[in-house]
Amino acid sequence: MQIFIKTLTGKTITLEVEGSDNIENVKAKIQDKEGIPPDQQRLIFAGKQLEDGRTLSDYNIQKESTLHLVLRLRGGGGKKKKKKTYATPKVLKRKLRKVKLAVLKYYKFDENGKIKRVLRECPAETCGAGVFMAQHANRQYCGKCHSTLVKKSK
């Protein structure tokens, strides 16, 4: 029977084969006509690659069927990218610790049972409520408006 082989260049080759012929025999005939070694040939029929150990009848290839010839690509992914090495270790992100009832550290109870605020709010109008002043040994400092209140020494 006669089958057609279509190459990537668009050229069509005609081959005389039998249904019992192996795929290796077909590749050998293509090598005789085109000079392409069988190990570089890939034959495709009905979207499937034809394996060397099978026959044409295994793939239901009949007379005047068209096989597509593509070349096998050798090689792989090329040069691998080298992993970067750093001289200093990577700085880990700080993990926030959730403290239960953390607000209580801003307030104290005096001997009468009254609540007293430990931190002082900034008196400046630009800061507003909720901006506390930092406690130093001899002064109080606002980090937002940079105002400083000096403590009176006894």
From Swiss-Prot:
Annotated zinc fingers (C4-type), start-end: 122-145
Keywords for the protein's UniProt record, in alphabetical order: Cytoplasm, Isopeptide bond, Metal-binding, Nucleus, Ribonucleoprotein, Ribosomal protein, Ubl conjugation, Zinc, Zinc-finger
Disulfide bridge partners, by residue number: none
Gene Ontology CC entries for this record: cytoplasm; nucleus; ribonucleoprotein complex; ribosome
Sites of the Glycyl lysine isopeptide (Lys-Gly) (interchain with G-Cter in ubiquitin) crosslink: 48
Cross-link (Glycyl lysine isopeptide (Gly-Lys) (interchain with K-? in acceptor proteins)): 76
PROSITE patterns for this protein: UBIQUITIN_1, UBIQUITIN_2
SUPFAM superfamilies according to UniProt: Ubiquitin-like, Zn-binding ribosomal proteins
GO biological process: modification-dependent protein catabolic process; protein ubiquitination; translation
KW Nucleotide-binding (keyword) present: no
Stretches assigned to the Ubiquitin-like domain: 1-75
Pfam families listed in its UniProt record: Ribosomal_S27, ubiquitin
InterPro entries in the record: Ribosomal_eS31, Ribosomal_eS31_euk-type_sf, Ribosomal_zn-bd, Ubiquitin-like_dom, Ubiquitin-like_domsf, Ubiquitin_CS, Ubiquitin_dom, Ubiquitin_ubiquitin-like
Molecular function GO labels: protein tag activity; structural constituent of ribosome; ubiquitin protein ligase binding; zinc ion binding
UniProt family annotation: In the N-terminal section; belongs to the ubiquitin family.
Other observations noted: Ubiquitin is synthesized as a polyubiquitin precursor with exact head to tail repeats. Some ubiquitin genes contain a single copy of ubiquitin fused to a ribosomal protein. In D.discoideum there are 9 genes: ubqA: 5 copies of Ub and a final Asn; ubqB: 1 copy of Ub and ribosomal protein eL40; ubqC: 1 copy of Ub and ribosomal protein eS31; ubqD: 3 copies of Ub and a final Leu; ubqF: 7 copies of Ub and a final Asn; ubqG: 5 copies of Ub and a final Leu; ubqH: 5 copies of Ub and a final Asn; ubqI: 4 copies of Ub and a final Asn; ubqJ: 4 copies of Ub and a final Asn.
Name of this chain's protein: Ubiquitin-ribosomal protein eS31 fusion protein
Taxonomic classification: Eukaryota, Amoebozoa, Evosea, Eumycetozoa, Dictyostelia
